[in-house]
Amino acid sequence: MRRTPVVASRALSERCGHDVWLKCENLQRTGSFKPRGAYVRIFGLSDSERANGVVAASAGNHAQGVAWSAATLGIASRVYMPTGASLPKIAATRAYGAEVVLEGETVDESLEAAARYAEESGAILIHPFDHPDIVAGQATVGIEILEQLPDVGTVLVPLGGGGLLAGVAAALKLHRPEVRVIGVQATSAAAWPDSLAAGKPVKARSMNTMADGISVALPGAVPFAHVQDLVDEVVTVSEESISQALLLVLERAKLVVEPAGATAVAALTSLPDLELDGQVCVVLSGGNIDPLLLTQVITHGLRASGRYLTITVTVPDRPGGLVALLELLRDLNVSVVDVIHSRVSGELSLGEVAVTVSLETKGPDHQTRVRSALARAGYSVA
């Protein structure tokens, strides 16, 4: 297991007026914090339990954490993954030593299959977050933060099922009760605000977020008790703020994180009223993101920050029609990323062509100027 570094972030420090440090769990074994809990859980098994092996269900990080931990301890592992799981994550899980079984369309269906296998075979089911040993393993993140940043005043942690937040909060509050601990969820998959208000785990109203690593419908009972007693605040962040945070970490800290790993950064950058005390530590919980998804999220972040604009312009279908448009965009100091034309739209008149251009812009104000200039030049813009 790696003792992951904490890295100072000048960009975030300047934004929020506090010294901000990044706890880089994206640099942990398998690319996320998950092996910490999985290793502790599997290490605690008896010899007879170890002989039957372990089983888990996951679409990504937990799968790899269990596979690596079991292999490190010399124990057989089987991991059930949804049939739609990404090929890189399937390949990584196998590479870490697990037998991978693709069953079910969702993680919940895969978990049902894993539970059936555990009952039939005697294998021990390793839950991703709802077990005391899992929480204890994740607590090592909090212990390291205290050792690396003795004066830390606020810690922000991504929040899904609750195992990571519960463990970090338990470690911090045991040694430094005054440290402020904040959990961060995606607004579009936020079970925790309703759960804390109800005093018990409650299912999320929706599950539609790019942050699949924290997309958990029902909080765990074990972590819920810790979060309820120890965590100072739980906040939620939008999809736009998550993609912008991922882009910021990539550009300024030179670190690759997955959307779930960027949620705590998103809280710093998008919630101006967030209460922070002293030195701030932000946990980057993971960095496992498919290259294609990374491209999509980067584009999403660029759009959200006004740095990427796609518009469709109607131009005359004659020689020089496209040139005139591109010259105008050049004069507006716009970089053209892509150009697509179509003559088959039912909304076009004879002698017209629709040109879809993707542009690199310098912010929302620049985009407004571009649209205004095109309109003044007589172009129909969509």
Predicted features by range, described:
Residues M1-A382:
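PLP-dependent amino-acid enzyme catalytic core
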